[in-house]
């Protein structure tokens, strides 16, 4: 199948230019003005619209077994919803149970993901430590195309990685040339605060943000960053929700450390007032970790995105329907943590980013696609509009509008955290692997069409880190022997 996208403005992370884009056999074959229509090619008229790299959501959880239930969104429905919003690839997470071999968990997630209709990859979580984990990390990087390992500093008595696990895993990642990703919340403090709140009779969703204040996130982010500094490994802090974690990242980056930061679309726009909603179901629907914060944090996060100290935008798409959330009706600590957004991320960020002047269209491409592709080493195959790149593209209508609602979205969940928000700037066409999968409000997807994307490790980054380490290597002091 071949497609010519004609008459649009190509927008990449670096430039904007009037050009046509020709795609064939799943890749981009030509980019330039006034391309001739090859025989048999379909034509997408993109006049007045932007042609951009498809979005990459680097943080999703499809079909996640968590907190006594399983996320309602599966890999087919979730990737279909992503395509409807202009996102053409997700990076999900393999999360082994404590004592479960990493390879066993990886194989399970690969099996679940076979139904995906868009391309995907996996971070793998390190939830415990042993020689088996050490060995499995090596197999995953060398034979399975994994270059990133996740560490949960929260969820005590479940999947929390303590400092010993962090040190061992970060050290092994450095040996392998991988990057470490971190959910930064002090799990011991969260557990302590949860118990105090329950004893005080605060059992509803309003207790959730009280048990996870910004200081808990800031401390953990700083600790993970400093451990990474000592071990000399790159680190990526996921879902930054507050100025405290942003400050830790900004400080480390100003000191030359290789630290990256992610922000969720929801954390840029929603405040903690949602937990005070008198309707329990509405309040519980917003329970996720880290929680939504007081309004002042949102502007700080936007500034982090504008300054480049936060490089990527994600969703942490992890859906639980109302009956699942109701598992914690009498105890907020039992409400399954997670919200949706994989379908809405691009339009929400365009409306509130480009539409307000916070971001240029090029910066939008950078934070929704290209930076993630570069950080996780799949660029320029993904995240670019260039000859030889995968034909994963979105044709973006900057004037089209819609009102977001659970009644009309494609996500498999019965609420939407952006409910009632009217956004301007939508995907008119989404192209995945060179095929039109979203056209003017209609999906045309194939179950199982998604491919697993291998991600190699980072020899150039580690080459630089190794040179720095050699220059700083401690050397013993040569002294005369005592006579």
Question: What name fits each language-model region?
Answer:
Residues 135-313, 318-321:
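Histidine/acidic residue-rich metal-binding segments in metalloenzymes
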Residues 111-126:
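A glycine-rich helix N-cap at a beta->alpha junction
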Residues 8, 26, 48, 59, ...:
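Divalent metal-coordination and catalytic microenvironments
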Residues 1-53:
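Histidine-rich, glycine-flanked metal-binding segment
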């Amino acid at each position: 199948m071949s497609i010519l996208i004609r008459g649009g403005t190509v927008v990449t992370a670096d430039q904007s230019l009037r050009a046509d884009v020709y795609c064939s056999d799943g890749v981009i074959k030509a980019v330039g003005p006034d391309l001739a229509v090859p025989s048999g090619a379909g034509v997408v008229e993109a006049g007045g619209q932007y042609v951009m790299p498809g979005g990459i959501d680097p943080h999703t959880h499809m079909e996640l077994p968590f907190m006594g239930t399983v996320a309602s969104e599966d890999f087919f429905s979730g990737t279909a919803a992503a395509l409807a919003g202009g996102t053409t690839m997700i990076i999900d997470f393999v999360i082994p149970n404590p004592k479960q071999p990493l390879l066993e968990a990886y194989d399970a997630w690969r099996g679940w993901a076979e139904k995906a209709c868009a391309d995907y990859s996996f971070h793998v979580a390190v939830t415990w430590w042993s020689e088996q984990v050490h060995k499995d990390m090596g197999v995953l990087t060398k034979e399975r195309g994994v270059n990133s390992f996740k560490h949960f500093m929260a969820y005590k008595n479940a999947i929390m990685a303590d400092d010993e696990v962090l040190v061992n895993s970060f050290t092994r990642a450095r040996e392998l040339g991988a990057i470490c990703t971190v959910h930064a919340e002090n799990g011991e403090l969260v557990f302590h605060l949860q118990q105090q709140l329950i004893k005080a009779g605060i059992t509803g969703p309003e207790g959730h943000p009280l048990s996870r204040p910004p200081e808990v996130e800031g401390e953990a982010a700083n600790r993970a960053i400093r451990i990474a500094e000592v071990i000399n490994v790159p680190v990526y802090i996921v879902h930054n929700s507050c100025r405290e974690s942003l400050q830790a990242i900004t400080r480390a980056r100003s000191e030359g450390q290789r630290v990256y930061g992610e922000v969720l679309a929801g954390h840029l726009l929603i405040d903690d007032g949602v937990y005070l909603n008198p309707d329990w179901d509405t309040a519980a629907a917003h329970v996720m970790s880290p929680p939504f914060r007081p309004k002042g944090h949102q502007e700080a996060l936007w500034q982090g995105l504008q300054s480049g100290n936060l490089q990527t935008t994600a969703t942490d798409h992890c859906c639980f329907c109302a009956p699942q959330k109701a598992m914690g009706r009498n105890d907020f600590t039992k409400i399954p943590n997670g919200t949706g957004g994989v379908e809405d991320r691009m339009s929400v960020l365009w409306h509130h980013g480009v539409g307000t002047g916070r971001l240029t269209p090029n910066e939008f491409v950078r934070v929704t696609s290209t930076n993630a592709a570069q950080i996780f080493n799949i660029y320029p195959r993904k995240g670019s509009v260039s000859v030889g790149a995968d034909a994963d593209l979105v044709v973006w209508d900057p004037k089209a509008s819609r009102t977001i609602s659970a009644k009309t979205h494609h996500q498999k969940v019965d609420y939407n955290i952006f409910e009632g928000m009217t956004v301007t700037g939508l995907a008119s066409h989404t192209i995945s692997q060179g095929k039109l999968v979203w056209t003017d409000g209609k999906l045309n997807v194939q179950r199982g069409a998604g491919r697993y994307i291998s991600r190699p490790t980072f020899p150039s980054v580690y080459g630089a880190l190794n040179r720095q380490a050699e220059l700083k290597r401690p050397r013993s002091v040569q002294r005369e022997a005592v006579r």
